[in-house]
Amino acid sequence: MKIVKYKNTEHHEIWDNYVKTSNNGTIFHQRKFLSYHKDRNFDDSSLIFYEKNTIKALFSGAVIDKKLISHPGASFGGFVYNDMTFQASRDLIALLIEFCKKNGLNEITIIPTPFVYYNTYNEAMEYSLFHMGFQIKEYYISSFVD
């Protein structure tokens, strides 16, 4: 698996198409929404995770003060994916940690998509984050009307 840093001119369409067909992508992950915040003081460091030329996941994020964080232009961000197994989520997280170390980033803060927005309920990523030493620093409540 490999990580490619998002580039607007090359990846806009494939990013948005993946979000639309993903299990947990929302308007907050769409590039049009994230681009609205382009004049803010952060480096958009969104990432695309490929496995054999196929997108495995996206990560909408930014770098501020040597920290990779969920995109500050959205209420939540983090990983966007289709089907996710426990092992696949561990592999993605390990690759993200390795990427951060190689790029001199010393902290990762993720605000995951609330489960209410998932097409199919799946806690593999959140469990893997916990299992790999990530800590919950904040809780948010989400609800919706159908």
Can you say where each PLM-predicted feature lies in the sequence?
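Short amphipathic alpha-helix that is part of the acyltransferase structural core
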Residues: 1-31
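Generic structural signal for residues positioned in beta-strands
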Residues: 2, 46, 78, 109, ...
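Structured loops at beta-to-helix junctions and adjacent beta-edge loops in soluble globular domains
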Residues: 6-7, 62, 82, 113, ...
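Residues that cap or initiate secondary-structure elements
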Residues: 9-10, 53, 85, 116
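A generic fold-level signal
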Residues: 10, 41-42, 137-138
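Exposed alpha-helical structural elements
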Residues: 13-14, 32, 95, 124
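Conserved donor-binding loop and adjoining core beta-sheet/short helix segment
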Residues: 17, 34-100
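Acyl-donor-binding surface of acyltransferase catalytic domains
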Residues: 88-146
